[in-house]
Amino acid sequence: MIRTFYAFALVVLLTGVRTAVAQVEDPQLSMYMYNPVYYNPAAAGSEGVSRLQLVQRTQYVGYTPTITSDGGAQSTQLISFNMPLAGIKSGIGIYAFNDRIGPITNQTVQAAYAYRLALKSGTLALGVQAGFYSKGYDYGQLRPGEPADPLIPTGQISQARPDFGAGVYYNTTDYWIGVSMKHINQASYVLGTDRSVNPLSRNAFLTAGYRLGIGYDIDVQPSVLVQYSTVGGVTSSNVSLNLVGTYANRIWAGVGYRWQDALTATAGINLLRDNSLRLGGAFDFVIGGTQIKSATSYEILLAYAFPALDSRKKPIVRTPRFRY
């Protein structure tokens, strides 16, 4: 199985390196392996715990634009929650993000449902997601050559549209693999004149990883993320590779590579007696396109896994007639 996984990852890598330009509708994350529901609705409930997670990412720290003075670096805030529903062989999740890059603001709220089917060696899940995706543009940040041109919009414009996605996810105690697609309906936005139609790109994702124990307290986890986008006949792809080592299920650190873009370093710790509180960070060192990018990016992750409900303990039922 290990050979099969690495062979598959190699095929994915070789087929995905044609270009390294990703659409901005779905912000990239360096710690993608800890955000499965963001990439695939079928991953809802796959961890077996209820987890709330927050992510802050600042892209190209210190980037200074030429058209405005308030900064143009991309900034992303992501919040997600997912939980298993073992009684009905399902999982549910929800995530929302706010993403800004210069005058462009993208926001979304998505709810996910996964049906989880137990197989002999693992669990196969089919998932769907639905929500709203909003795109906004602040024309006040632009400096047009002809400010009096009546065809140039002014002020802030935003529109929200329904948005849908689907995915398939298979996981065992040792490895996982998933395929998903976002923006299946490819909603369109008119932000300005009637001629400026902006459709969402259909983004397909492949995620895969393997947990390999190499000692009593040490395990390593190689993983891969492939993104493929298409809009208006134009396609692009992006590949990220990562290797994380964990000690005593508490301290973890890793390195990664985003194809033709950046080297990444990640580190974190699981806190509290049951390791339910996760704190992590990532640092990107940009190596591609440095003439138009700042050299560094960073990402912070905070997550909490809620204790499992004890089904053996009968709940206390209180009524107005009998109060205990």
At which residue positions do the language-model features occur?
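Bacterial Sec-dependent N-terminal signal peptides
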Residues: M1-D26, L243, F322-Y324
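Subset of outer-membrane beta-barrel
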Residues: Q23-Y324
